[in-house]
């Protein structure tokens, strides 16, 4: 049977080869010339075409004035100031859920008087795609989840009683999830468009929305018990599927953190973090790091992070965010050990 199959394949190959070697050059039996068509493409020599998820990202706060897009920096090699927005591939807005959704059914991107609306319109005018991360945890910051969600009965922790607006919502709470689902659906109605949106940073839980220090216990934000691993996996699966359901045309990303979804913020990588990253990817996500260039072994970009990037390299896009950048001294004298050149 194997010899018969080999013979058939060989015969098919020889037949194809003999056809390919025909003396007929396409001119027909009389050997006439084939009429040609001259094509003259209309080239656009001025507009820059950016590949998706390539290039530099311009960070913009949701409370900035649109004039921020006119910010210039001096480039020594050019010997002149240049407008940063002209060299950016995306505009990254990391902001609060409460800013984007101040009241139930009200959205800042629909309010012409809001700064968010004005920033979005300016970015679109500049043809600068937007990226969002929506932060819900109020620790270190303030009222990140809208008050109407808590008024409806959503559970929360308050780890800093002297700052009553710094509430931490419980992401497994059904009331929280109901309002968050409504918000994500509305966000997608406006921004599920690759012409205007570069990517959505679709997790946003934990401190600063970075995916670590995620609390599941309203009495103790650092509590870890026998149910923690199950709950954090269920929450990550819920939120990534939620974004994937509504954002079908733009990339979704998640921070590949060593303690992703865990109540802690640093230390040895959690044994389940790798599988959580894989779960997010299976739900349609790409990955990004918030700590690129930070070489601290407990919370920076170290062995575990490099291994995750190597594992998924060439399989999904990987976005890097440079960690804190020095401003008071030279990069090359920084303890982080940046390499020059």
What role is predicted for each listed range?
Residues 1-19:
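Sec-dependent bacterial lipoprotein signal peptides
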Residues 14-38:
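Bacterial Sec-dependent N-terminal signal peptides
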Residues 34-47, 110-120, 129, 157-175:
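Short, charge-rich amphipathic segments
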Residues 36-75, 87, 124, 128, ...:
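Catalytic-core regions of glycoside hydrolase
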Residues 78-161, 232-250:
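Aromatic-lined substrate-binding rim segments of carbohydrate-active enzymes
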Residues 97-112, 163-179, 221-232:
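The substrate-binding groove and active-site-proximal loops of carbohydrate-active enzymes
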Residues 155-222:
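Active-site groove signature of glycoside hydrolases
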């Amino acid at each position: 049977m194997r010899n018969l199959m080999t013979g058939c394949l060989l015969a098919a190959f020889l037949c194809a080869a003999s056809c390919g070697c025909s003396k007929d050059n396409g001119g027909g039996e009389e050997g006439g010339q084939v009429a040609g068509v001259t094509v003259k493409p209309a080239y656009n020599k001025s507009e820059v075409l950016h590949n998706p998820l390539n290039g530099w990202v311009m960070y913009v706060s949701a409370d900035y004035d649109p004039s921020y897009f006119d910010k210039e920096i001096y480039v020594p090699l050019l010997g002149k100031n240049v407008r940063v927005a002209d060299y950016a591939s995306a505009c990254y807005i990391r902001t609060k859920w409460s800013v984007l959704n101040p009241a139930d059914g009200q959205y800042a991107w629909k309010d012409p008087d809001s700064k968010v609306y004005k920033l979005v319109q300016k970015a679109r005018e500049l043809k600068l795609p937007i990226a969002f991360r929506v932060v819900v945890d109020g620790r270190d910051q303030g009222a990140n989840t809208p008050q109407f969600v808590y008024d409806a009965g959503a559970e929360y922790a308050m780890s800093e009683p002297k700052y009553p607006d710094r509430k931490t919502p419980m992401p497994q709470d059904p009331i929280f999830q109901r309002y968050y689902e409504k918000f994500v659906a509305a966000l997608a109605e406006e921004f599920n468009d690759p012409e205007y949106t570069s990517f959505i940073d679709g997790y946003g839980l934990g401190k600063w929305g970075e995916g670590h220090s995620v609390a599941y216990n309203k009495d103790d934000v650092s509590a870890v018990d026998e149910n923690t691993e199950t709950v954090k996996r269920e929450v990550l699966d819920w939120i990534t599927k939620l974004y994937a359901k509504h954002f079908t045309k733009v990339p979704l990303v998640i921070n590949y953190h060593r303690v992703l979804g865990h109540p802690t913020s640093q230390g040895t990588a959690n044994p389940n973090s790798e599988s959580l990253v894989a779960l997010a990817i299976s739900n349609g996500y790409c990955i990004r790091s918030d700590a690129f260039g930070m070489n601290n072994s407990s919370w920076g970009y170290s062995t575990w992070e490099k291994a995750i990037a190597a594992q998924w390299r060439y399989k999904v896009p990987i976005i890097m965010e440079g960690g804190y950048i020095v401003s008071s001294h030279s990069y090359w004298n920084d303890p982080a050990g940046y390499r020059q050149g």
